[in-house]
Design a protein with these regions (language model features):
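N-terminal helical cap/lid subdomain that shapes the substrate entry/recognition surface
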Residues: 3-111, 115
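Asp-based, Mg2+/Mn2+-dependent phosphohydrolase catalytic module
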Residues: 1-12, 22-23, 46-47, 90, ...
Length: 235
């Protein structure tokens, strides 16, 4: 499938999951929590599946009371601490990766992702990432898919305690790299987080409706739209 993007802009700012990366994770299945409990027991923290799942959600909710975006590393570290295990940064990072890998069913690029990124770089455009995500999950996945090299700067919500559609997250990127909204195009698959969020700071927008997108509404109008035919969507 060939997808073309208007090359009249200086800056191109991408969402990640559901826009560039096609991902399916499942955190609701018992086998994930059984595996995580076993992992914690291996490192001296005794849990069964129900207990670690309950503890995980408890600590996530506690972190969300402090900030609209959390750092999931703090959650996994607390799960060790309450069992008397002093987990160092290396163990916490490994735990984050284990959780993510175990809960991921598929991770791949959409067929248009590389051609667009390559075309933008070939034409000397600035390419940035602005993603609602956890750095401990995301950077590893981007490295695995070999796409880090296409981005001039990467901004992940867990680093800043704020996320889309909050204009503050967009403004962080704009201020740090000196981006002019009028010279920028935001590309994303979520009409609220990506399109309305980018429009709130004056950016033009390119909406792509993928298998990971929330239900489409005609009430939100992007500058450009690409609606994937049902037969082209991945299952």
């Amino acid at each position: 499938m060939q997808v073309t993007v208007n090359l009249d802009y200086k800056n191109y700012i991408f969402d990640l999951y559901g826009t560039i990366i096609d991902i399916h994770t499942e955190e609701g299945e018992r086998k994930l929590w059984k595996a995580l409990a076993k992992y914690y027991r291996k490192h001296g923290a005794f849990y069964f599946a129900c207990g670690i799942r309950r503890g995980y959600h408890k600590f996530v909710n506690e972190e969300l009371k402090k900030s609209e975006e959390i750092q999931v590393e703090k959650v996994f570290k607390k799960l060790f601490e309450v069992k008397g295990v002093d987990a160092d940064d290396t163990l916490v990072a490994e735990t984050c990766r284990y959780f993510r890998d175990t809960s991921t069913y598929h991770l791949r690029l959409y067929e248009w992702s590389l051609p667009i990124l390559q075309k933008l770089k070939e034409n000397g455009k600035k390419v940035y990432l602005l993603s609602n995500a956890q750095r401990s999950f995301t950077y590893h996945e981007m490295e695995k898919l070999d796409i880090v090299k296409y981005f001039d700067k990467i901004y992940i919500s867990s680093d800043y305690g704020v996320k889309k559609p909050n204009p503050k997250f967009f403004q962080i990127l704009m201020e740090k790299v000196g981006v002019d909204a009028k010279e920028s195009l935001f590309l994303g698959n979520d009409q609220t987080c990506d399109i309305l969020g980018a429009q709130s700071v004056g950016m033009d927008t390119w909406y792509v409706h993928t298998n990971c997108s929330p239900e489409y509404t005609e009430d939100v109008k992007a500058t450009y739209e690409f609606l994937i035919p049902e037969t082209s969507k991945r299952n």
